[in-house]
Design a protein with these regions (language model features):
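Mobile amphipathic helical/loop "lid" adjacent to a hydrophobic cofactor/ligand pocket
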Residues: 86, 93-218, 235, 530, ...
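N-terminal Rossmann-like FAD-binding beta1-loop-alpha1 element of flavoenzymes
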Residues: 19-46
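Glycine-rich FAD pyrophosphate-binding loop
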Residues: 38-61
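Active-site/ligand-binding neighborhood in enzyme catalytic cores
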Residues: 152-295, 302
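Conserved FAD-binding subdomain of flavin-dependent enzymes
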Residues: 56, 64-97
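N-terminal chloroplast transit peptides
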Residues: 1-14
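Mid-domain catalytic core of redox enzymes
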Residues: 40, 240-241, 251, 269, ...
Length: 586
């Protein structure tokens, strides 16, 4: 019976035309979805506004030098991306990523703090110490790494420990934390103003791209928990070792997926008849420079059946029809555009209208080519408390240190002259209107030489500036319920991206995180497969590797807190008085 059913299902799968799924948006989430869909036998059309979403065509400045928008790190707990690089693409991990590196925080007063590399053995007073349980290990390892913040202020960070154990006690509690700003929570938990201003605020500005007063307390706690509490080594970070992330990882992935062919159904003919075998069709079509303006729903089924887009090269409006499913791998800005152009979808999926109402964050990326090499303590660095930032978060990365195997690549294959510095401004709305020359002047005169004096001796050889208005998700207070779900109200429409709520498929990677974006793409494909939209026999689920288990003392702390809170709220007197287990949130 089993084999009969299997044979019938297999035959049906071969005879049916492959499902055709459109992916709107590239990046980690779009390519994650493409990978899982194509490996499941689907036909995929990926549309993105950038000219070449595959990464095969590197972006060059007008003077022929390489440029990448934003410098993004790869933290210790990125198991799915590491598996993609090593197992799926067969790349040498050490050729793709740098070693884990230290990071430095600089203010107008100079060096403020240095982040250790825990996996290399943290040091205290010059002596290497063994890995200690979290959070004890982090506290001990950073004793002598803060240059100016007094110990009395650092100790107040302990007030956050309870919040990190408490905020995920249940969905209701999480939403209560989400409605509160991180700034309010820090006050209620007794974190000193100096600790917030000198360390936590700059960290959030470059981690979630907004200051504490504009961030959801729940998402801030997620970030701090994921990177700082769950494991001592979770904060260890490394970087792309050459060229760009798109060239080293996404381009090989696109090449591999482009080699897939759709299955050819068995030839149908009468006995003795010679039947021509059709040529296998490529499983992947990539439409770069394509702006999707709307989705069409089938009036009968209420499912996505097509979309319209504009070809940037020609200005021509085109359509894609006969879709079996669709993945929206978009941020808030892209979601707003698609929903506004899709009246039927807006009526059917109010959750996407809510997502489209959320705001996003402005980003500016600057790359500087200098006439001499500038030595720094660490290759990755953060600006803190500089008035010239106008409320933005700022980072600078010494690419000549991170990508030192072939420095000529950083200079467009010309003879290297000195350091190449990648600088990013987040929450950069107050800087957007400044001309390029003023942004480079601020960096060369007001920021870099104050952080590292040797920059004062360097002269600018070349520079390039790009602005990205509304480019990044803003996790504002109360935004959780408005973030798009993995599965929408339209059964064959799913969402992917670091801001997506994955529900029962929730992953341990949190915040503005490449791992989370990639995993969400895999899970978006899995959702279409589970719901039968890829066809009979195409329900295969792409494996998603979970984050390693939290350290046992952290798990125990959460369990004890939940047990006590549940017992407290179950008390009849507590119920009668309307008391809360976490009275600082509501």
């Amino acid at each position: 019976m089993f084999w009969t059913l299997y044979a019938a299902t297999h035959a049906a799968a071969l005879l049916q035309p492959p499902a055709h799924v459109a992916i709107v948006g590239g990046g980690w989430s779009g390519w994650g979805a493409a990978k899982a869909l194509i490996e499941n036998g689907a036909k995929v059309t990926l549309l993105d506004a950038v000219p070449d979403p595959t990464g095969k065509t590197p972006f060059l400045t007008p003077t022929g030098k390489p440029f990448e928008a934003g410098t993004r790190g790869f933290w210790m707990d990125y198991p799915n991306i590491v598996s993609l690089v090593t197992s799926d693409l067969g790349l040498d991990e050490n050729a793709v990523f740098t070693d884990y590196t230290n990071s430095s925080f600089y203010s107008p007063d100079g060096l403020e703090a240095t982040a250790p590399v825990f996996s290399k053995g943290a040091k205290i007073f010059g002596q290497t110490i063994p890995e200690l349980p979290s959070p004890l290990g982090q506290v001990v390892a950073t004793v002598d790494l803060f240059e100016r913040v007094p110990i009395a202020d650092r100790v107040t960070m302990l007030g956050l420990l309870y919040g990190m154990l408490d905020f995920v006690r249940d969905e209701t509690t999480f939403e209560a934390y989400d409605r509160m700003s991180a700034h309010q929570l820090f006050i209620k938990m007794g974190i000193s103003k100096r600790m917030v201003d000198d360390f936590i605020k700059p960290t959030l500005l470059v981690g979630l791209f907004k200051p504490p007063e504009e961030l959801s307390a729940a998402v801030a706690m997620e970030l701090l928990y994921f990177y700082a509490l769950a494991h001592q080594t979770a904060f260890d970070v490394r970087w792309i070792k050459s060229k760009s992330i798109t060239e080293l990882i996404l381009a090989p992935l696109a090449d591999k997926l482009a080699s897939y062919k759709l299955p050819i159904p068995p030839a149908q003919g009468t006995a003795g008849e010679v039947v021509a075998v059709p040529e296998a069709e490529a499983a992947l079509t990539v439409l770069g420079g394509s702006f999707v303006s709307g989705l069409q729903l089938d009036p009968g089924t209420g499912q996505v059946s097509g979309l319209t887009y504009t070809d940037r090269a020609t200005g021509e409006k085109r359509s894609l029809e006969g879709l079996s499913g669709c993945v929206l791998a978009l941020g808030a800005k892209g979601m707003k555009s698609v929903v506004q152009g899709s009246p039927a979808l807006a009526r059917r999926a109010p959750e996407l209208c809510a997502a489209a109402s959320l705001d996003a964050i402005d980003v500016i990326s600057v790359r500087l080519w200098l006439d001499r090499t500038v030595p720094t303590r660490t290759p990755a660095n953060v600006f803190s408390r500089f008035e010239e930032l106008r409320g933005a978060g700022g980072t600078f990365f010494m690419l000549d240190q991170l990508q030192d195997d072939n420095p000529t690549l950083l200079w467009g294959n010309a003879e290297p002259q000195g350091s190449v510095v990648a600088c990013d401004f987040y929450n950069a709305g107050a800087l957007l209107a400044l001309p390029d020359e003023e942004l480079t002047r601020i960096l060369m005169e007001d920021l870099l030489p104050v952080a590292v004096s040797a920059f004062g001796e360097a002269k600018l050889v070349d520079s390039y500036v790009q602005r990205f208005p509304g480019a990044v998700t803003w996790f504002s207070p109360g935004s959780y319920r408005k973030r798009p779900p993995l599965q929408t109200s339209v059964s064959n429409l799913v969402c992917a991206g670091d801001w997506v709520r994955m529900g029962e498929r929730e992953h341990g990677a949190k915040g503005l995180c490449q791992e989370r974006a990639y995993v969400s793409g895999l899970e978006a494909s899995n959702a279409l497969a589970r719901n039968g939209h890829l066809g009979v026999g195409m329900g295969r689920q792409h494996i998603v590797i979970p984050i390693r288990d939290d350290e046992p003392q952290v798990v125990a702390g959460r369990a004890v807190n939940k047990a006590l809170a549940d017992a407290f709220t179950a008390n009849p007197l507590v119920k009668a008085l309307g008391l809360k287990a976490s009275p600082w949130v509501r």
